[in-house]
Amino acid sequence: MYWLQGDDGKSVAHKLYLDPYMDLFNSEIVSFHIGQTPSAAGIQSALNEAIRVTSDCPYRRTFHSDQGWAYQMKSYTKRLKEERIFQSMSRKGNCLDNSVMENFFGLLKQEIYYGRIYHSYEELKTAIEEYIVYYNEHRIKKSLGWLSPAQYRRKHLAA
């Protein structure tokens, strides 16, 4: 959320929408879209980037999501079928099915959002973009042998 001053001089909260795609091999965010409103075009753009980035995957790809409206769009499901990507969805009302992504959102909020006030969409968008670079390149994880997601990927590609 970011805050803007309304016509009456009071601060008004505005939402920002983040649609990330995570590779579960190493928890790396491979693509994302940030917008001021939920956007089918933005989600499709992030989907296309995730497909491009993972195109050399030697195994069947599975894209998991919650049951949000965007992931049920015909254009979204058609694109997955064209690429022979299996679509997996969380059960309705069960955040545990999407716990890896929920964990990422929790870290993001804890590390750049709580206790900070953002005064514009651009300020918050930039902070999120910078955090995703930090998360991928520098934020170590115990489950990855104390490596960052990008370091873990490079280590396994070199092997």
Label every PLM stretch briefly:
Residues M1-A159:
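Charged DNA-binding/catalytic regions of mobile-element recombinases
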